[in-house]
Swiss-Prot record:
Protein name: Monopolar spindle protein 2
UniProt cross-references to Pfam families, sorted A to Z: MPS2 (PF17060)
Highest taxon listed in the record's lineage: Eukaryota
InterPro entries: Mps2 (IPR031433)
Species of provenance: Eremothecium gossypii (strain ATCC 10895 / CBS 109.51 / FGSC 9923 / NRRL Y-1056)
Length: 338
């Protein structure tokens, strides 16, 4: 009796095991169907994304909010050998989720945002996590490779910019040469009847005239800038200050002296004469603090050096036997301190 009961229980157990196997096989086939549904073969990352996406997007809205992104990324670990991201990546994703919590993301936007925050694509991250490699080291290598690529791109951009500048300078040089040849051709075309030597000489003269005209035009512009001091201020509605007036008068005086060198020389000579007279009077002038005795009064002809010298010369010449009296002697002694 008990043997029949045991056989019945064993038969029921086998039926339950077979039913469980059938259900498991059906679920597995359904999962494979989801992975292969759509256009062609689906990648491993896309298949896992579809599974975890349905769990987060329970309302089937077709998008998730940014605040749900950490949960979505964490669910990838159920299908991989280890977590999809490192701790630094999780912090970056959490910061993005807290900064824009209600930002809507569809699957494509999620992939691009994931690549921006993590530094690698979702497919690459899934492959690395599925193989069980040390993730921080691999992701660091990926970031270093990305940084190296950015540095190379920056160097390439700088090199291209320098090359572009060099080409522009060369283009300007060729443009100036072309303009010169064009002027030469037009000149020869208009003077083809003349001889070769005379035509060349005329072309050189015309180029010199053109250069002189350009220099004259530049000098005229500078002259107008120098002469238009107060006029420019008046046109601008500004009142000229004393410093501006002084600078304007100084420029005008300098231009006048440059145009009239003789007048400048005479003015300089006159200024020197006035300075010498004033300084000489200041040096040789009498000191009012020192009282000097008044000199004896002399005749007017003795006050003139030339007339006095002539008088005494004639006197000594024509009156050699003139008698020297006591008065003359006393005057001589007092004069020379004898």
């Amino acid at each position: 009796m008990w043997r029949e009961e045991a056989r019945e229980q064993l038969r029921r157990g086998r039926c339950c095991f077979a039913a469980a196997s059938v259900v498991s096989t059906a679920k597995h086939n359904k999962s494979l169907g989801n992975c292969t549904h759509g256009s062609g073969v689906m990648t491993e990352a896309e298949g896992i994304l579809n599974n975890v996406w349905d769990a987060v997007d329970s309302k089937q809205q077709g998008f998730i909010y940014a605040k749900d992104m950490p949960d979505l990324v964490g669910r990838f670990g159920q299908f991989l050998a280890q977590s999809l991201t490192s701790r630094a990546n999780d912090e970056a994703i959490a910061a993005f989720a807290s900064e824009k919590p209600f930002y809507k993301l569809d699957k494509e936007q999620f992939k691009s945002t994931f690549q921006t925050l993590v530094g690698t694509s979702l497919q690459t991250a899934v492959e690395l996590a599925g193989h069980g490699e040390p993730r921080p080291r691999l992701f660091g290598a990926i970031r270093r490779a990305s940084a190296t690529g950015d540095e190379q791109a920056r160097e390439e951009l700088e090199r291209k910019s320098a090359e572009l500048s060099r080409v522009r300078d060369e283009l300007d040089e060729w443009k100036s040469k072309y303009q010169f040849l064009e002027r030469e051709f037009l000149f020869y075309q208009t003077h083809h009847e003349n001889s070769v030597d005379s035509t060349q000489h005329e072309f050189i003269i015309s180029e010199m005239k053109r250069t002189i005209e350009e220099q004259t035009r530049m000098i005229g512009q500078l002259r107008r800038q120098v002469q238009g001091g107060t006029q420019v201020l008046a046109r601008a509605g500004k009142r000229a200050s004393p410093v501006d007036v002084f600078m304007y008068v100084s420029r005008q005086g300098l231009l006048l002296l440059m145009r009239m060198p003789k007048a400048a020389f005479l003015l300089l000579l006159l200024g020197y004469f006035v300075w010498y007279t004033v300084m000489g009077g200041a040096v040789q002038g009498p000191d009012p603090s020192v009282a000097l005795p008044e000199p004896p009064k002399q005749p007017w002809w003795e006050q003139n050096n030339i007339i006095s010298a002539l008088y005494w010369y004639l006197t000594d010449t024509f009156e050699p036997s003139q008698r020297i009296n006591d008065t003359v002697n006393d005057n001589y002694n007092s004069l020379f301190g004898l």
